[in-house]
Amino acid sequence: MREIVHLQTGQCGNQIGAAFWQTISGEHGLDGSGVYNGSSDLQLERMNVYFNEASGNKYVPRAVLVDLEPGTMDAVRAGPFGQLFRPDNFVFGQSGAGNNWAKGHYTEGAELVDQVVDVVRREAEGCDCLQGFQITHSLGGGTGAGMGTLLISKIREEFPDRMMATYSVVPSPKVSDTVVEPYNATLSVHQLVEHSDETFCIDNEALYDICMRTLKLSNPSYGDLNHLVSAVMSGVTTCLRFPGQLNSDLRKLAVNMVPFPRLHFFMVGFAPLTSRGAHSFRAVSVPELTQQMFDPKNMMAASDFRNGRYLTCSAIFRGKVSMKEVEDQMRNIQSKNQTYFVEWIPNNIQTALCSIPPRGLKMSSTFIGNSTSIQELFKRVGDQFTAMFRRKAFLHWYTGEGMDEMEFTEAESNMNDLVSEYQQYQDASISEGEEEYLEEEEPLEHEE
């Protein structure tokens, strides 16, 4: 089977991770201690993508939980699904990274990283045919951002040919957690551009908007936000966990979604949106799902795809859905919104189907888009970065941990390059002279 090893780092990563495991345990009929009491063989058929079977009919997640302070992990352990995880897979330090990327990447995190890699190696050895890794973390803090990116590059060294997917919570314009978020995020993006295969960008502000606008929650908690993220994560991994007519795995997804190696930052959406307690009572149809799925209000990253163009996108439908209906709807969307799709990648929408819907829904769809408008998000962080870096504000926290200012400059220019690459492909059209187009292409090849 094609197993995936899951890592969660830092406070944000661990909380999203915990919500994810709660969601998929429910879908596979597992209770809080990993005992199977489901009703359908389909739940068991590909259980071992994410779970190891232990003795006594118990299933244990292939998850490694990492943090530089014990607090969040104690909370996970005390939560409803805390008994699910393998106790040796909790790896934590005592000092904390204090929202300092350098602490997570170079000092505190670097001391702990070998211990984590050992646990990851042990999990990987328990797999028949490891497909890849997924990591949940935020980019604004110290541990998830600094140590998370360190882990990614370490795992890359050890398993160069496996897929690396990240679910990264990017800092949002209005909801700021710390002052140094732009620094941490820029340094992290600098790493992700080089080492990740696919990055699903999630943005707290967009999640807040969805909770307030669509779900009508007056004051959403982080629990509500994490519930949304876990719905998307469960959707993205559906094809791996359940049999379906059109399956896709992390590698197929990347092949279909990433036209140029550096441009692997995706926007995600989910439909129908429901709040934690309520399940949707009205019947949804494929046209409604497609409509809602392509609605900018449904995107979980605060950038509006109408300001850019889709290079590629992928839709994953779950439930009793007719293949033909889906194809028709997707074609319909594409022909109505031609301006939002680049014309030099024909058939750039990929569809996957899975016959098992999420709990409490008849059907659902998950959307993954590679849109050039994601540059807004990097631009915004970059502007905040530049504003502080020009005055060298807060730099001493980083240089004190042994970082060099050069690294900041490099990260800044790498992120600016990323933005202009997105812009270049947004403006590109078929009609441009072939020759000049090829010349533009070349430098990208040799960047490694």
UniProtKB/Swiss-Prot annotation:
Keywords: Cytoplasm, Cytoskeleton, GTP-binding, Magnesium, Metal-binding, Microtubule, Nucleotide-binding. Tubulin is the major constituent of microtubules, a cylinder consisting of laterally associated linear protofilaments composed of alpha- and beta-tubulin heterodimers. Microtubules grow by the addition of GTP-tubulin dimers to the microtubule end, where a stabilizing cap forms. Below the cap, tubulin dimers are in GDP-bound state, owing to GTPase activity of alpha-tubulin. Belongs to the tubulin family. One of its GO terms (molecular function) is metal ion binding. Residues 432-448 have a biased composition (Acidic residues). Residues 425-448 are annotated as: Disordered. Its main location: cytoplasm. Dimer of alpha and beta chains. A typical microtubule is a hollow water-filled tube with an outer diameter of 25 nm and an inner diameter of 15 nM. Alpha-beta heterodimers associate head-to-tail to form protofilaments running lengthwise along the microtubule wall with the beta-tubulin subunit facing the microtubule plus end conferring a structural polarity. Microtubules usually have 13 protofilaments but different protofilament numbers can be found in some organisms and specialized cells. PROSITE patterns: TUBULIN, TUBULIN_B_AUTOREG. The lineage of its organism: Eukaryota, Fungi, Dikarya, Ascomycota, Pezizomycotina. Disulfide bonds: none annotated. GO terms for cellular component: cytoplasm; microtubule. This is Tubulin beta chain. Its cofactor is Mg(2+). GO terms for biological process: microtubule-based process. It comes from the Eukaryota. GTP binds at Q11, E69, S138, G142, T143, G144, N204, N226. Mg(2+) binds at E69. It is found in: Cytoplasm, Cytoskeleton.
